[in-house]
Amino acid sequence: MKLTDLPDSRGHFGPYGGIFVSETLMAALDALRVEYDAACRDPGFMAEFEYELKHYVGRPSPVYHARRLSEEYGGAQIYLKREDLNHTGAHKINNTIGQALLARRMGKKRVIAETGAGQHGVASATVAARYGMECVVYMGAEDVARQAPNVFRMKLLGATVVPVSSGSKTLKDALNEAMRDWVTNVESTFYILGTAAGPHPYPMLVRDFQCVIGRECIAQMPELVGRQPDAVVACVGGGSNAIGIFHPYIPHENVRLIGVEAGGSGVASGKHAAPLTAGTPGVLHGFRSYLMQDENGQIIETHSVSAGLDYPGVGPEHSYLKDAGRAEYVPINDDEALAAFHDLCRFEGIIPALESSHAVAQAKKLAPTMKKDQVILVNLSGRGDKDINTVAKAAGITL
């Protein structure tokens, strides 16, 4: 079976993925899979999805040659896929529009979501307003504090934001609560999962909705440089922006795919969120993948300066691509990401999300090892307005 043909009918990417949930959710997931299969074969559904991406989101997003950044770093030419220019400021909206159209197709009037950085919460609240649905967003209490502007945005858009105070009070705990809500209200509620993780069919359908990123790049790069890039770099938390740009490139064997995890305070410190670098396979949130866990299988608390990467698992397709050797995964620590954030601000006039700054930081390491006529394509997954407070605090500045 080719890498691009996965998952199999049971949602497996080799040993990863699958469905590990309570009986209550099995029927809901099966109904979702059946509805999604039908939607994919329905030209009307796909046409509406594409219409919304063009006229509501503002796609295609441009690919931009970061000339001054390339000069500063030396070596390869750096190009940025500008997902930060989408409506709501990140790649998340590609997926929430697709899932909201599915929810409407299934007759669901209430949607729920989990969020870390708040971008998926904002994108979910946005599409709920767009299609006239009730929206509840679960968010770790620590992230509510870190991402106050996005919390207010969600409320402006009509969503109810529920702070989650259990565990580490971050994305993992928000996801737990969202799944509890779904079990309780499965008849009326559609769960808009924010990343390419969770039980089947979510990793597949989120990837499919995000693949617009990579498909656009494959069309755009020859116009800009006459060929495809030598390397594609994207940050990986759950991994939806990365799989969205990686997946269409999988058959292009001479294109390196590099996923960048949150190295936090350094992998050796144990305070990080890099399961592909330092984790082991296990089951969490309904799927099997590389996880941050101890020898007893208990989830270890994660750390990252970036709320959106602060997750102890990763999408199952990334785990499979790692094992298959088709993609490579590297950690970038907080300080490196913050430095890259400032670089992009100063040299290109672009304020990136801290998540995306991890990918820029990897380009900073990679570019000098390559020739001047080689090309790195960085997925700039979101803009950094939401992170201004965090960046100021890291610099000892009070806003």
Swiss-Prot record:
| Signal sequence annotation | none
Q: In this chain, where does the modification N6-(pyridoxal phosphate)lysine occur?
A: 92
How does the annotation summarize its subunit structure?
A: Tetramer of two alpha and two beta chains.
Give the species this sequence originates from: Thiobacillus denitrificans (strain ATCC 25259 / T1)
Keyword Protein transport annotated? no
The record lists the catalysed reaction(s) as: (1S,2R)-1-C-(indol-3-yl)glycerol 3-phosphate + L-serine = D-glyceraldehyde 3-phosphate + L-tryptophan + H2O
Q: Which GO terms describe its cellular component?
A: cytoplasm
For this protein, the record's Gene3D superfamilies field holds:
3.40.50.1100
Give the encoding gene's name.
trpB
Q: What does this protein do?
A: The beta subunit is responsible for the synthesis of L-tryptophan from indole and L-serine.
Q: Cite the Pfam families for this sequence.
A: PALP (PF00291)
- Name of the protein: Tryptophan synthase beta chain
Top-rank taxon of the source lineage equals Bacteria
Cofactor(s) listed in the protein's UniProt record: pyridoxal 5'-phosphate
Q: Which HAMAP family match?
A: Trp_synth_beta (MF_00133)
